[in-house]
Amino acid sequence: MTSSPVLTATGLVKRYGELRALDDVSLTIRGGESVAVMGASGSGKTTLLHCLAAVIAPDSGSVVLSAPGVEARELVGLGEGERARVRRESLGFVFQEHLLLPELTAVENAALPLLLKGLRRPDAERHAAGWLAALGLAGMEDRRIGQLSGGQAQRVAIARAQVTGAPVVFADEPTGALDSTTSAEVLTALLHATTGQGRTLVMVTHDADVARRCSRIVQVRDGRIVADSAADATASGAGSATGTLAGAASLSTGLDR
C-alpha cells in the first residue's frame, strides 16, 4: 500500500538575479521515504531542499506540508516568522556541520528543541537522554561537544533533530565532513532514527554510496529534476527499526500535549 504524501511541491521557481536556481520543479515525497537529492555544485539541489523545508521562499510555486500529526498547510506565502514556527514545530534538521553549541553538554544540545516548545528542563533532558542512548551515546550525556568525536557530535545533532518527533527530517550533506567508516555509521543511525521509525528523510548528498542507501534518488541539473527513481536500498536496513530506537521513539509521544 502506497503511503500518503507528506510534502508536495508544484512548479517551484527560484531566481538569484538572472540565474534560475529552480526552474518549474515539481516533486511529491511520501511518508516513510528516504529521498537522496543529488547534483553537481550549483545544480539547485540545496535550493530545492531549502524551499521544501521552509528555510527560504520560492519566487513562485507551491509547497504543501501534510505530514502525520501536522495540519496540512501551504508553506509558500508564509512570512519568516510563520516559516520559523513550521520549522520549529514540524521539521527536523541535520547539517554537514553539526551546529551544536560548544558551551552546552550533549544532552543540553539535544534538548534545545523541547525547551523551545515549552517543556520543563528535567523532562526535556530526560527525553533527549533517551535518544542519545538509543543512538549509542549512553554515558556521554554530560560531555561537552569538544569532548566528542565528529561522528559522536553528529549523532547528537540527529538526536536534536528527532527529539520532538518531527515527521520530516531534512539533512544537508550530513556525512560530508566524516571519514568513510564514520560516515556509514552515522548514516545508519540517521536512517534508523527517521525512516526506521516511519518518518521521512530528505537528504542532499554528493556521495553515491550514501544515496544508494536511500529508498529513492532525485537528480537535479540546472534547476530541474532530470531523474527520479528508486535506489538500491537492500543494504540500508532503513525499514527495520532497532529495539533501542523503537523505545526511543516512544519518548517523543505526547510531547505536544
PLM features: residue spans?
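Short coil-to-helix segment of the ABC ATPase nucleotide-binding domain corresponding to the Q-loop/switch region
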Residues: 104-112
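A short, proline-enriched helix->beta-strand linker immediately N-terminal to the Walker B motif
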Residues: 163-167
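ABC ATPase C-loop
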Residues: 137, 141, 161-162
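Helix-to-loop junction immediately C-terminal to a conserved catalytic motif
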Residues: 53
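The feature captures the beta-strand-to-loop junction immediately N-terminal to the Walker
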Residues: 38-40
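Conserved ABC ATPase signature
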Residues: 144-148, 152-154
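ABC ATPase NBD Q-loop/coupling interface
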Residues: 62-85
